[in-house]
Amino acid sequence: MTSGSTSAAVAADQLPGLAMSSPDEAARAARAVLSGAATPVDETYALQALGIVQRERGEVGRALRSVRRGIRVGREHGLGARVTDLEASLGTVLALAGRRRPAFAAFDSALDGAEPAERARVLVRRAAVCFFFQDLDGARRDSHEAAAVLERHDDPAWEARARSNLAGALLGLGRFAEADREFARAQELIESTGERYQATIIVQNRGDCAHRMGDLPRALRLLYDARRRYDELGVVPPEVVRDLAVVQLAAGLTEDAAGTADELVAVLDGARDSALRRSDGFIAAAIVHLAAGNPSRAADLARKAARSSRRQGHDDAERHARVVVLRAQAEAGAVTKRHARAAAALAAELTDRYASERLDALVLAGRLASATGLQELAGEALRTAAAGRRGRGSALRRATGWYAQALLAESAGDRRAMLRACGRGLDVLDTHALSLGATELRARATVHGSDLAALATRRVAVDGTARELLRWTERWRGTLHSLPWPAARHDAELAAELGRLRAVGSLIGSHADEAERRRIEERIRRHVHGRETAGPRTTRRRLDVGELLDALGDRTLVSIVGLRGGRFHAVVARGGRLKHVVAGDSGAALDEVEYAKFALRGAAVAADAVAGVLLAAAEPGLARLQETMLGPVVRELGDGPVVLVPPSTMQSVPWGALPALRDRDVTVAPSATAWLRARTSTPPPDRSVALIAGADLASSGAEVGVLAGVYTDATVLTGDDATADAALAALDGSWLAHIGAHGRYRGDNPMFSSLELADGPLTVFDIERLQSPPYRLLLTACESGVGSPTGADELLGLTTSLSALGTAGLLATVVPVSDAASVDLSLVVHERLRTGDDLGAALLAARRAAAGARDRATAWSFLALGGA
């Protein structure tokens, strides 16, 4: 290399490598070489780099001209090694142009007479082209040979590329464990060279491998790491954004995935990538938007992908895009015989590279054919889908196979086989959920079982017994409470980040705080999402109906389920018997709930006269809400306490405000299984009490002060002493705890719902650090009982995590309430708890003791949750 023939920062022989990590810089430097007095060898490097940049931007014609010009220069000056290298580059460009035969001819020419090390570097690139054309065995052979030669020649950079290609081929062949080992070795090699860009590519590939192995926490951790590395390098390839969106979707993080998909579309619209890369990216974004409930956006993106693929002759990619268009159209209501036949035809045409997409197409064809009377086509499509995927592939693919089996059985009128297939599919998803160490992921992952659960529940609601309906409702409800809780462990990194979050939260008035808070929250979520399960794997706790009926005693349990586009169905368990009752229209409930909460919110903080007017105006709406949710169930309630198990979307109903429930002992539970666990749990032998007053709560001093006089041995934290760490220490293992603090419900991010303490917010993530949760906990914070519905029928929030951790009884509110009124209520509740009442009975006493309208509104806004 001659000085002066390159830019001041880059030598000519470094330009081809720079073309991948910094294409703009490489292009500028290459043009500077070509416009100056370059030596022939430097000219070949510059032309090769320019060709790589043009290739990656999708400018295939220009790339071919640049590389061929480099070959001519090399031949004219007898630069044999450079010609070999450039012919390999030519083969890669020709492959991207879809010209398979000329591409392999270029590689044959490059290999002819090449020295061993040169030959190995050519084989690395030919392996990549073999992979591109789905010749996985060819890619494996070339990569294996190249890796062995390059190891002998002590060339770690190229050996890393060879092993990365080998891993990709093994991944495509389904040999995941071998692929993972090769990727790990490739990363080790490339890290030793200091090539940060290539190292980042391998981290990304390891994330894709982990995803295919079904290890979503590890996949998220690796892809988040890859994205961070790319950001530091200032280069964000669309592939990493695509992979992250796909894995976020698989993890149930639909909103996150939709945001990532929008970023992907923006990257693709602003980039000049190859048609295939653009097509793959647009398809991924379309699938995410389809899952996020935006079929119109999904269809537009999929059509864009289809056009791009068609122009370049990428048939499989075009077929895949057309499948997504059909799925989006079906979601939007286009259910016709033409659509069914089109889906079946596309499924038949997709190659093995698109096996997962073929499964989706088969299930779609089966559903559409069944709905439009094409029973023979439906049976054929569903049989193929069920046979191919029930026992292999990722958990989500296996569950889809069982869904196909269930649809097949339903179309054949085999009720028993249909329910069995639904159960097997949900079993697969339980195992999948157990692999996730983050509770948020466990809750959100249940969305993948929604179709299975809905299919079975709809059927038993029509022709099943009350016992069947209860069992199937419990089968997919309250998963966080039915699966073993991830073992608590010390996590220094998480603790430090939560401390930083509190520090930022306490800096009131700083304009920079909000952006910093968002950054810290994102780091926390990414860290927790990458957490893997610690400890032995066990199974889901199943409901024992006999045990439930025995435990109820004189109580009545009402399990409510809302069917899509239908009515609320309830199973009433009382006196050792079960009864199925049909209530009101499920579509009418949400508006009534919001109106009821609006009225209570106003009345709970108003003067008594105004509160009375607001409550009187709310009465007709509360009566309508009762009729919608319960209807004839009211006549089945008996005289004893009532346990309500509503859908997650109805957990925040102010149940104590409903006319038939105001004068009853009422508790609410996320599932019958959760209530039974709470009811039969053993209180701690050490009856320790924790009393905690939060920050900036004018009435909390009086409340906690009075309670401290009642519980003379309690741990009392007020003022600056009420820090997060001190509160957690006091809560851990306590028999009874009371926190009077302002609460903040985060609908945008429920795991950051919090209680305001002296040093900042105590979040759900903090609560999950408890080794042993309090047996009973009273939360007088505003909206402390509100959670975010997610997944199939789950809630995320403060009370959900506490009850899933093992807290047997909780008192919380569903709307903001008056601090002063909640103090009076708290004192009544504590008085009754000390006499031996459970929380439901204690809250009933508080409702009865409420003298004025504002006090009644406050009492109606509280829920007793759990079973103690």
Protein language model features and the residues they cover:
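Cysteine protease catalytic core and zymogen-processing segment of caspase-like enzymes
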Residues: 660-675, 744-808, 825
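Single-residue signature of alpha-solenoid repeat helices
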Residues: 26, 63, 103, 139, ...
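Amphipathic alpha-helical segments of tetratricopeptide repeats
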Residues: 31-35, 71-75, 108-113, 144-154, ...
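Catalytic-core domains of enzymes
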Residues: 579-581, 588-599, 643-736, 755
